[in-house]
Amino acid sequence: MRENYGSTMIQALRTVLPIQEKIKAKEKKYICLDISEEAGAQLLKELEQTRFKARTRLLRELLEKKRLDYTHAAKELGTTSAVVKKFQEQGIIRIEYDEIMRTSLNTGDISGERRMPLTDEQEAAVKQIQREWKKPSPKPVLIEGVTGSGKTQVYIKLIEQTLSQGKEAIVLIPEIALTYQTVRRFYARFGDKVSVINSRQSQGERYDQFKRAKRGEIQVMVGPRSALFTPFADLGLIVIDEEHEPTYKSENTPRYHARETAIERARMEHARVVMGSATPSLEAYSHACDGEYLLVKLNARYEERPLPQVSIVDLSGKN
């Protein structure tokens, strides 16, 4: 990236590693009983004879629940840091931390997607791509499909195949098209295997999603241009939807193009690249015509649904 796009090494690294080191994990603090119930019960009897009411309340609650939310203990039981420190020094309790993953995706109302069967044309497109993938050096794939032809269903089928091989997938979608409805289709099909990043998320939320990817907790990352640098260990597929969109070209140094960078990452990691558009960019279409890309066409809308009607209205002279 530094050599191809004329940037410094620092600029290239900041692009590839977009999450700053100063972002820390979000954790929840817990107080846990660290002695036996018998010893705790004996200690509670002793404390009840003293004036240490806060210690008594905390120990009584711990004997019932064994593990308490630190915030709850402070608010509801009046537990202070001095009480916690004293119990820690005496070996009565220990402090534990649970990591909390930050996310802006509300998945509560997302149910499983009704699986739509592939049309004959979509099935033929998938088989054509699969034949290309069996070659020693498969080409990037460009799907030219009219609006509503079901390119996303083809992507999902190819992602399913990739995941069945134990590999991971990245789906690039322009920020303007990264809507709840778009994300919902992937989440409804793949569930918790999917994560999303976008520019509206906080740095902490993005940090957590990249961390989940690095740990292997997810297998599909959906997002704009920056999602290309998701730290997957075994990347198998990169999908670039609406590849003609100008937002795939970075306006900041290094001024890389996501399409070219995706193809290079795929080459380095032995992954596959699939691009799709109803109106492919001149560059991509030229590469396809020259045989550098495999061109796959979807000419019919799904279930032969008609295109929306368009009317031309003359508004001149109207208020």
Task: Give the label of every model feature segment.
Residues S316-N319:
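Cys/His-rich short segments
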Residues M1-S277, A284, C289-R305:
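Accessory, non-ATPase domains that flank or precede helicase/AAA+ motor cores in DNA-metabolism machines
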